[in-house]
Regions:
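N-terminal loops that bind phosphate or other acidic moieties
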Residues: 1-305
């Protein structure tokens, strides 16, 4: 069993671990486009919860810690992998709602719910990515049937690492670049940081270091275009566009999501009671924003070519 304090500290530890090694994760980034920002986006997403988590008292419940983290990550989510990361922690919030402490089975269910939410939110789920890594980790957690949290999380990390190392076999662009999936590597750094606290250790300290790549990444990063992994002319929707919709009363973004899917790709939309975080790769960001404003006022714009 873990307390709210332990869960709070574990999430902080995971956030620090990905922040410390974000540059190395950026260098692995070749899918869906080789824009070299996956580690940074994931770090900023989970890092958005740090101020609120650090302010929580040691007496907090697991429900309070998970809800605070999930809410902050939804609003701060950046990039495709960042939005998926926020969905994983939203699963924690839903599974742990109303609970003071959490059993191992609760954490397994939380991870499973997060993965299910992520698959539903992604327009076209692609295997060999963060989705595969977290799905197989969650399946192993559910199958473990252990009451021991450290043992459960060790199973999560072991299954996730195995899945990560297999990603080049599922996604040809990764094998061509000689790397594992950047999003999968990023979430494993988060899980490993959490494991240190679940095992009774201290929170991972914040200090950026070079992470040891799981496969040779010499072809990744600045060399991917020269390697012809993805030519510029092959990218039809060249603008990564992201924004928050602060919804009008009674507004539902279901139709907005359909519009984004019809006019772009890499669409991920996550919705809370009063806000929706929308991510899309498109050739016309202005058209996306013009449609979105019909559902509420917009903030947190990010448009990158």
């Amino acid at each position: 069993m873990i307390t709210g304090k332990t869960l709070r500290d574990a999430i902080i530890s995971g956030a620090n671990n990905i922040a410390n090694q974000r540059t190395r994760v950026d260098e692995l980034n070749v899918f869906p486009v080789p824009d070299g920002d996956t580690g940074t986006n994931m770090s900023m997403t989970i890092g958005a919860a740090l101020s609120e988590l650090n302010a929580m008292p040691d007496t907090c419940t697991v429900a309070e810690a998970s809800k605070s983290a999930a809410s902050a990550m939804l609003r701060g989510a950046r990039g495709n992998s960042g939005v998926i990361t926020s969905l994983l922690f939203r699963g924690f919030s839903k599974a742990l709602a109303g609970k003071t402490d959490a059993e191992a089975a609760d954490l397994a269910k939380a991870l499973q719910m997060g993965v299910e939410a992520a698959y539903k939110a992604v327009m076209k789920p692609t295997e060999g990515t963060i989705l595969t890594v977290t799905r197989l980790a969650a399946e192993a957690a559910v199958a473990a049937e252990t009451d021991d949290v450290p043992q459960l999380w060790a199973t999560v990390c072991e299954a996730g690492q195995k899945a990560l190392e297999d990603t080049p076999n599922l996604l040809p662009v990764l094998k061509k670049a000689g790397v594992v999936d950047a999003g999968g590597q990023g979430i494993m750094l988060v899980f490993e940081g959490m494991k240190q606290v679940f095992d009774g250790g201290e929170i991972v300290a914040g200090a950026e270091v070079a992470a040891k790549p799981k496969l040779d990444s010499s072809a990744a990063g600045k060399g991917v275009f020269a390697d012809d992994l993805m030519k510029v002319e092959d990218i039809k929707n060249g603008y990564c566009t992201q924004f928050l919709v602060h919804k009008d009363p009674g507004a539902s973004v279901t139709r907005l999501r359909a519009f984004l899917e019809s006019n772009g790709d890499s669409v991920v939309v996550i919705e809370d009671d009063d806000v929706a975080n929308c991510h899309v790769h498109t050739a016309d960001p202005g058209m996306m924003l013009s449609e979105a404003i019909k559902y509420g006022y917009l903030t947190n714009f990010k448009i990158e070519n």
